[in-house]
Amino acid sequence: MEINNQNQCIPYNCLSNPEEVLLDGERILPDIDPLEVSMSLLQFLLNNFVPGGGFISGLFDKIWGALRPSDWELFLAQIEQLIDQRIEATVRAKAIAELEGLGRSFQLYVEAFKEWEETPDNTAARSRVTERFRIIDAQIEANIPSFRIPGFEVPLLSVYAQAANLHLALLRDSVIFGERWGLTTTNVNDIYNRQVKRIHEYSDHCVDTYKTELERLGFTSRAQWKIYNQFRRELTLTVLDIVAVFPNYDGKLYPIQTKSELTREIYTSPVSEYYYGAINNYNQNGIQTERQIRQPHLMDFFNTMTMYTSYNRREYYWSGLEMTAYFTGFAGPQVSFPLAGTRGDAAPPFNVRSVNDGIYRILSAPFYSAPFLGTSVLGSRGEEFMFALNNISPPPSARYRNPGTVDSLVSIPPQDNSVPPHRGSSHRLSHVTMRNSSPIFHWTHRSATTTNRINSDVITQIPMVKAYNLHAGATVVRGPGFTGGDILRRTSNGMVVTLRVDASAVRNQRYRIRFRYAATSNFYFVVRRGNLGVNGREIMKTMSTGEELKSASFVLGEFITPFNFFENQVPLQIEIQSLSPGGEVYLDKIEFIPADTTFEAEYDLERAQKAVNALFTSTNQRGLKTDVTDYHIDQVSNLVECLSDEFCLDEKRELSEKVKHAKRLSDERNLLQDPNFTSINGQLDRGWRGSTDITIQGGNDVFKENYVTLPGTFDECYPTYLYQKIDESKLKAYTRYELRGYIEDSQDLEVYLIRYNAKHETLNVPGTDSLRTLSVESQNGRCGELNRCMPHIKWNPDVDCSCRDGEKCAHHSHHFSLDIDVGCTDLQEDLGVWVVFKIKTQEGYARLGNLEFIEEKPLVGEALSRVKRAEKKWRDKREKLELETKRVYTEAKEAVDALFVDSQYDRLQADTNIGMIHAADKLVHRICETYLPELPFIPGINAIIFEELENRISTAFFLYEARNVINNGDFNNGLTCWNVKGHVDVQQSHHRSVLVIPEWEAEVSQKVRVCPGRGYILRVTAYKEGYGEGCVTIHEIEDNTDELKFRNCEEEGDYSNDTGTCNDYPASQGAAGCADVCNSRNVGYKDAYETNTSASVNYKPTYEEETYTDVREDNHCEYDRGYVNYPPLPAGYVTKELEYFPETDTVWIEIGETEGKFIVDSVELLLMEE
């Protein structure tokens, strides 16, 4: 590389291009003053962004006090010439006159401000500065529309940006100093809110106007691309760069000096700018030229370049290049770029290596070889690259062949003309590409330094593109125009980037982290320092899917807990978790705020005061805002508790009382009983009812109060559940109510609100268990108590998950809500609202708390009409149901009554058998709406009459079991209590258990204890296959034998077979004193005369489980509450009976056959009545 120190004294404005663009007979001068003025202003804004007299004086000196009306003409003419559009004389005159007026008003304000700053206690000075502020504020509000007149927005854009910048500076002064001037707090807050609104309004107007015109210009030809690129470059310098610092005017977010960096690139093409006429005539493709502009990328810095030379018609020219670059902080691997152009060999390669602050200036010698007897060439025959070295004057340069006179400083002027260009330059060469043999230079602003150095006394902003590692799944996308550079985008969970921070000068300084982002979905943002976590917190969405990125789309996320750097060079990893599918996250920059103890205490107090005041509808704290959740109140309480006792004890006590009052108001409006989960199933008539496996746990790092954990279930027919009823007496007619709460994490959690019908949502909320240990601080206090001063979840009511009126909702927010509309109320019906939580999968789980059921708003309009229609439809359905229920109930009651002797329901009819009881039970279960299908433990409108009949069915089963002295006579328990010889089996046939004796040598018997002298009936239902006989014998030790025989040729019988020989046999007359259990031969034999209903062997009294209803055809879980659909006997079965009078206390029942197969359905031995 040839180092040359000559020609450094050539002023850049003494060099000009022979060819200049002509538009409407006028020249576009490459050294237009507005560029220099804008660059000087930008330097001032980036280096002196500190509120106070120094800033406003500098702003006046740079712009408003330095420019004459004729100078403002240049700002208008700059864009006029670029886009070939003239502003009407009246519009021009009005704009210039108003700009001049603003300058004069600003001068008066500056004078008043300086006087007040010198004598802040002087009443007259305070009044004067306040008056001047109000005058110029009103003047800008009134005049700024003159700088965006329809049809002339583009040529007026640069002066619009200057007026907007002035206005935001004035508003910042009033926000920071307003109360000291004598403005009320309300007035200052109003001004601040207006300032935030204006930042977004001014930014969006500038960017939208710029983008619209840029798209209109297009670049079909290379000549068009020249105009397109010049417009892009100069509007970036005069408008977009200034817009990029607008957010820093927010005095509450940036109360101290703020260091910002611009990472966007601008482009120059010496050949295009020199040989405009040639390329215009040749009409080369501008699209191909634009393709040489780099796509969005992580910021890198020029390192080395190898230049190749070719030869054409007696001219040596630059034909190709290869270059390398490095990332910020010299971290990560060196970046090598592929060959651009061609690798010519007409001369040895020429190497250029970056020195110190890089290349700030290039002198080019372009040439054009016409297509005559050879190939046409547009290229460069020589370049001189000049390096910015502050300690060497003149600085060195690298000269490739013969330098020319096309000076890059003409297109990109210095930011400070009071010093030599190598010190006052504004940009550095970052990259070079080629369109054939025509170089295109890429430049970055010098504010973007090669390291991410953290300063101890300023807010340091670091663009995210200054990372050195872009992880898989993350991308760099074109910036929206107001961010000062490109931004990052990620649409899935995972690491985003790793950036290196230089903390060598601030290792003992504590910092807080903020980051500017936009997102279409809630997510969890994590910052790691190597293998250690710095901070992690949930972040709320700022925009909807498909929306264009606007200024208001970007907000600041903040970590409250300060941290220290422990190393000089610190790698920080940025990670995104818990992002919903389809969600998008855009990251602009990360900020480091010095955590001064006093400042932090004041800042925390201000945040706490703002958070507490935001809870209430007015300053008298009489009512809570509707969108303030109970969970949010708890978090505000934590915020107050974490205030410093040393710096603000009195204020802390006052705020604590206000938060307690807010909590009481929250409890009063909450219609749920026991919202704090003091117990479940603790009271039969109120509060929460739920599964026994639900646990109540005390507060943790997420919940301040109790919360519940719902586990999964192994059987979806027996779900985990939690429910409560809101009584009708608590509800207002024609009102919307809202259920809401906070879910720490969940999977397959179903939430229902049930009245006329059910509103249902399934919530899957990703958890953050792995993130709770991220902080370098301990989560617990000295005594093991939770440290609630750790980073907390920032609440934003505008983006909480809320599903209303059929709207779709991404149920991945920890905050959830579900609403329901109530029509007319009827205390007699007491329909109420059921609140139900349910999990019916094995993988399901949930942790939730801070549940609320509150009145939201009266119903009007369409919502009112909708609930009236739903109510009428429900009542019509109920009337039909009542008619059907009456018919079914009558039929079922008659069948149940027929089982018993009388209305006392304590004795069965003598001929009542098991089939009759099952048949009656089936009729009872035809009653509809006995229990809610959503949860079978909640009674429906027919629950009372169902339970009435079902209890009698249960009594019938008990009485039947009590009078049958044979154990397991229906073989539902297999062969329990039966003695077996040979091969026998119990099989399922037609949903019944039957005894099958397939061989003549097999035998089944049971020893039964009886009362001698009493009469018994032996009743057997069986079926004989094939030849031979099936026999059931009853006998004692000494004779007294009788038997029932079954043949295949007999006529079919049924359960209702009545021999006419039986009387009534009440269970109350059973010989309880004769009870015994199975002996060693009859293992499992139980008391045949047990009178306790809970001892029933065959009947399942599972009333605490699930209910059956045959109207829910889509529910495969038959919620039968013990009901078994007992089918009638198939053809071939016969029921036979005989009377037997034992003489001793023991009899034997024996079952066998002679040949074929003998199938026994049931064996009964029933005690007769005395």
From Swiss-Prot:
GO biological process, one term: symbiont-mediated killing of host cell
TM helices/strands, residue ranges: none
Species assigned in the record: Bacillus thuringiensis
CDD domains the record matches: delta_endotoxin_C
Keyword flag Ribosomal protein: no
Protein's name according to its UniProt entry: Pesticidal crystal protein Cry1Jb
SUPFAM superfamilies: delta-Endotoxin (insectocide), middle domain, delta-Endotoxin (insectocide), N-terminal domain, Galactose-binding domain-like
Miscellaneous comment text of the record: Toxic segment of the protein is located in the N-terminus.
Keywords noted in UniProt: Sporulation, Toxin, Virulence
GO molecular function, one term: signaling receptor binding
Keyword Acyltransferase: no
Free-text function comment from the UniProt entry: Promotes colloidosmotic lysis by binding to the midgut epithelial cells of many lepidopteran larvae. Toxic to Plutella xylostella.
Domain of life assignment: Bacteria
Family assignment from sequence similarity: Belongs to the delta endotoxin family.
